[in-house]
Amino acid sequence: RFTFDCPGMMGQRYLYEQVEQVCDDCYNLYREEKIAVNCRENCFLNSWFTVCLQATMREHETPRFDIWRSILKA
């Protein structure tokens, strides 16, 4: 398991775990370490995270994840 600290993570562990689960699920699909790392770059604010949302068939949750990622990046 890879861990990357986000500035807004303190007190938002639940949000972090929800967002991180997308990267974990994406890694489990492809079994490529670079995907797991890239998905978490810049506190999940990157195009890889979007690709992982689509790959895990969760793109309908994009607005919620956008808010959560913004909170974690703050």
UniProtKB/Swiss-Prot annotation:
**Entry-linked Gene3D superfamilies:** Crustacean CHH/MIH/GIH neurohormone
Alphabetized Pfam families for the sequence = Crust_neurohorm
Subcellular location(s): the record lists: Secreted
What's the protein here called? Probable molt-inhibiting hormone
- Give the classification, highest ranks: Eukaryota, Metazoa, Ecdysozoa, Arthropoda, Crustacea
Gene Ontology molecular function = neuropeptide hormone activity
Give the protein family: Belongs to the arthropod CHH/MIH/GIH/VIH hormone family.
Residues bearing PTM Alanine amide = 74
Q: What is its main location?
A: secreted
> According to its UniProt entry, what is the function of this protein?
Inhibits Y-organs where molting hormone (ecdysteroid) is secreted. A molting cycle is initiated when MIH secretion diminishes or stops. Has little or no hyperglycemic activity.
Can you list the disulfide-bonded cysteine pairs?
A: 6-43, 23-39, 26-52
Keyword field contains Protein biosynthesis: no
The entry's keywords: Amidation, Disulfide bond, Hormone, Neuropeptide, Secreted
> A biological process (GO) annotation for this entry?
neuropeptide signaling pathway
